[in-house]
A protein has these predicted regions:
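Proteins with a high burden of low-complexity, intrinsically disordered sequence enriched in S/T/G/P/A and R
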Residues: 1-4, 110, 167-170, 174
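Aromatic- and acidic-residue-enriched carbohydrate-binding clefts of CAZyme catalytic domains
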Residues: 8-62, 77-116, 145-166
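Helix-rich catalytic cores of soluble enzyme domains
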Residues: 66-70, 85, 115, 122-126
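A short, terminal or domain-edge coil/loop segment
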Residues: 7, 20, 63-65, 122-133
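Gly/Pro-rich turn-and-neighbor structural signature
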Residues: 119-175
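Aromatic/hydrophobic pocket-lining residues that form π-stacking "cages" and hydrophobic walls in ligand
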Residues: 56, 67, 175
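Hydrophobic faces of well-ordered beta-strands that scaffold small-molecule active sites
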Residues: 2, 60, 67-71, 134-136
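Active-site beta-loop-alpha junctions enriched in small/polar residues
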Residues: 3-7, 72-76, 139-143
Length: 175
């Protein structure tokens, strides 16, 4: 699979959300994403345009290779949340940390704006790639990432969901 997003960057052009790449694919001093892992203070990074992806898919097809895109969700979304903080509930007072030491890197799939965003992004990606599946990660979500979320607590009560794991399963089955 082709890992196109993670905590560190957003590497695929989504036409409906251009800030994902203009702000989320570069890091450096005075950038939305600060320098990581020795990348230095100069602006560094980049992304794949949809035309470049189509070209790569076409080339891979000639070699009998299929490409499965991966958009890492609901965790591993630190960069996404720097660009679109509204995808995480502001009233949540929990500070969660993942295995890579990124704090608060999990989107809130119970929010309508998050559902709309996911629908838009996954539709653009499914129109772009010929592979029948999109890998959405679902790994390494910090255990307490949704504990303080009033909207998730409310959603879980309304839908008789008893744990964050069950909520994640529900989310996965409905995106």
């Amino acid at each position: 699979h082709w890992h196109l997003t993670d905590n560190e960057a957003w590497r695929i052009e989504i036409k409906k959300y251009p800030n994902l790449t203009t702000q989320g694919s570069y890091r450096g001093y005075n950038q939305k994403i600060p320098p990581f892992y020795g990348s230095g203070y100069n602006k560094y990074g980049g992304y794949y345009s949809q035309d470049e992806i189509r070209e790569l898919i076409s080339y891979a097809k000639k070699l009998n290779i299929e490409i499965m895109p991966e958009i890492d969700l609901p965790a591993h979304s630190w960069t996404l949340l720097q660009v679109m903080p509204e995808l995480r509930e502001e009233t949540s007072n929990i500070i969660s940390e993942d295995v890579g030491s990124y704090k608060n890197n999990t989107i809130n799939p119970s929010l309508e704006k998050t559902k709309s965003f996911l629908n838009d992004v996954l539709l653009e990606i499914s129109d772009l790639f010929t592979f029948p599946y999109i890998h959405v990660g679902l790994d390494e979500r910090p255990n307490n990432s949704w504990e303080g979320s009033p909207s998730i607590i409310h959603f879980m009560k309304q839908n008789n969901i008893n744990s964050q794991e069950e909520f994640q399963d529900y989310y996965m089955n409905n995106i």
